[in-house]
């Protein structure tokens, strides 16, 4: 299962570390906006005026509001949060 998340985890971690605003579209068409606060294998914690736990199986699309750098934000952990910052190697 780790191979399936080899793109997903660095993408979400870069969004989290750079505090990039995102729009998350759910499979039912609802649009959520905020910043990725943390995530794991099953959920994303999205922060705006409140924090929302969004299950990944309900997500259709994640759209960053601005360009960001995915390179250098990878580590071998299965989830990321504010206290899990790893050296970026940049």
From Swiss-Prot:
Residues covered by the Sm domain: 9-68
SUPFAM superfamilies according to UniProt: Sm-like ribonucleoproteins
Cell membrane keyword on record: no
GO cellular component, one term: cytosol
Keywords carried by this UniProt record: RNA-binding, Stress response
Entry keyword RNA-binding: yes
GO biological-process terms attached to the record: regulation of DNA-templated transcription; regulation of RNA stability; regulation of translation, ncRNA-mediated
GO molecular function: RNA binding
InterPro entries for the chain: Hfq, LSM_dom_sf, Sm
Highest rank taxon of the organism: Bacteria
CDD domains from the UniProt entry: Hfq (cd01716)
Function: RNA chaperone that binds small regulatory RNA (sRNAs) and mRNAs to facilitate mRNA translational regulation in response to envelope stress, environmental stress and changes in metabolite concentrations. Also binds with high specificity to tRNAs.
Assembly mode: Homohexamer.
Family affiliation: Belongs to the Hfq family.
Name used for this protein in its record: RNA-binding protein Hfq
């Amino acid at each position: 299962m780790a191979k399936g998340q080899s793109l997903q985890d660095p993408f979400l971690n870069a969004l989290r570390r750079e505090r990039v605003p995102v729009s998350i579209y759910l499979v039912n068409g609802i649009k959520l906006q905020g910043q990725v606060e943390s995530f794991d294998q099953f959920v994303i914690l999205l922060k705006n005026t409140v924090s929302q736990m969004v299950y990944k199986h309900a997500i259709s699309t994640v759209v960053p509001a601005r360009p960001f750098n995915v390179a250098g934000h990878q580590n071998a952990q299965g989830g990321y949060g504010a206290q899990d910052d790893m050296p970026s190697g940049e």
